[in-house]
Amino acid sequence: MTLFLVIFFILFLLLCYFFSFKRTNKMEIGINPIKKIPWSDNEHIFVSSLFTNKDKYLTGPMRLTYRPDSKTAVLDFKGTNYTYYLDNFDDVRKLVPTLLLSK
């Protein structure tokens, strides 16, 4: 019985290591891309949906640029720049769904 528990404990530790330190989740792959070209410095190109009204949305490629000095994120979509101030809670609430819907 003890050998059985020790084997499962070692198996549990190996699985914890694998899921924690290997590239298994989408966030880790997105933050540290291996061969992902769109990243260049602090801007990223992705496809997402932008909600213009309650029932209308537009989908297409967007370019997100983060400016750490002014704490802003500028989203360029079809020639229109949308500026989100990360200090403002309402702007963050508008930006998060766009980032979550990106493919």
From Swiss-Prot:
It comes from the Viruses. Induction: Expressed in the late phase of the viral replicative cycle. GO terms for biological process: fusion of virus membrane with host plasma membrane; symbiont entry into host cell. Unglycosylated because produced in viral factories instead of the classic ER -Golgi route. The keyword Transit peptide does not apply. Disulfide bonds: none annotated. The chain crosses the membrane at residues 1-21. Keywords: Fusion of virus membrane with host cell membrane, Fusion of virus membrane with host membrane, Late protein, Membrane, Signal-anchor, Transmembrane, Transmembrane helix, Viral envelope protein, Viral penetration into host cytoplasm, Virion, Virus entry into host cell. It is a single-pass membrane protein. Coiled coil: none annotated. It is found in: Virion membrane. Interacts with OPG099/L5. Component of the entry fusion complex (EFC) composed of OPG053, OPG076, OPG086, OPG094, OPG095, OPG099, OPG107, OPG143, OPG104, OPG147 and OPG155. Except for OPG095 and OPG053, each of the EFC proteins is required for assembly or stability of the complex. This is Entry-fusion complex protein OPG086. It comes from Fowlpox virus (strain NVSL) (FPV). The lineage of its organism: Viruses, Varidnaviria, Bamfordvirae, Nucleocytoviricota, Pokkesviricetes. The gene is OPG086.
